[in-house]
Amino acid sequence: MFRLENMEQVVSLAGLLHDFGKFTNRSSNYVENIKNKEYKTFKHPVLSKEFVCFLEENNIIESSELLENLKELVLKHHESDIFSKVNLSVKNIENEKLQRIGNIIASSDNYSASERRDEPVEYNKENINWMTKPLNPIFETISLKNDVNENKTSNFAYKLNTLNYEAIFSKQLTKETNKDSFKGNREEELYKHICNFFEEIKKIDSNSYDIFFSQLYLLMEKYMWCIASDTQINISDISLFDHLKSTSALALASYKYHKENNILENGAQPSAEIEQFKVLIGDVSGIQNFIYDGIKSEGAAKTLRGKSFFVKMVSDAIALYIIKEFDLSLTNIILTAGGKFYILLQNTEDSIKK
């Protein structure tokens, strides 16, 4: 069991867990099992807070004032009054400073979900069950002729599974389920998937925040990579994990920007007009020469794989070192591939100097 030590940890976790309830509310069986608890509603923000309480009840996170702040930020993370009847918007946070931090979480959620669109979203017209609608691949919306019809529906989707090399290939959506196709997620599969996640979470035993965050992050990726973030649109091709990861990265970088510029202490509200973020791009040079130099025909494939793996490990190690120096989290590493890495930073003078 570990204890939260600072608001940076709270903000990073709040971003990662704010929409966790969109994972558990996909199963009516799961929701039914917790209805004995005294909640006025079982909307996804309430289920997100329920997960934080689960971590506390299972002695994974120690009770503290910071943990109570985390519960409040996860519960009230919407700018709009979409849940006004049950007081789940940011403006319902009573503590003024915490409310300003709540606005950072809400803004980061909006940035990640692209909720501020110039054009209205075309919502699902086929009355597909939002609870069982699977994640669609992005490939059907790729076009070299720029003639993608945004109102079309997807013919392929990912089957519900933990992340593995076989599961990453999408299946055709049909009226019947067989080896090469299926008609969508099923309630019993969703419930089992969620229960398996919770069983693995219970095994986390660490007195270190960093170790806990890494384990939580990897388990969320393992189970939520195939869960669609938004199931109200025709093609749901953004996973819940990717939305939560990017929200966490944006929230932490934004919080550090506002904190280092004393914006929160001065009582000012976070603003979308200021440039809060920087993207650091790194490139490990000389990769091609390193990989192909001295390659012999015998055992060439094994040597190439080994050298490619080494390059990946080097770029990962550099990225991890950088986020440690900037006091950021795993979520701030946007991508590491091909000897390159992309990291989301706060746009501050201190960051630029580093």
Ranges and model annotations:
Residues 1-150, 157-163, 272, 292-304:
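Divalent metal-dependent catalytic cores for phosphoryl transfer on phosphate-bearing substrates
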Residues 319-343:
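Conserved helix-loop-beta segment at the catalytic/binding core of cyclic-nucleotide signaling proteins
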Residues 280-289:
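Catalytic-site or vestigial catalytic-site microsegments of nucleotide-handling domains
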Residues 298-326:
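Surface-exposed, low-hydrophobicity interaction/linker segments
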Residues 275-277:
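Conserved catalytic motifs of the protein kinase core domain
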Residues 345-353:
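Helix N-cap motif at beta-to-alpha junctions
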Residues 1-52, 156-160, 167-233, 237-259:
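Acidic/His-rich, divalent-metal-binding segments that scaffold phosphate/diphosphate chemistry
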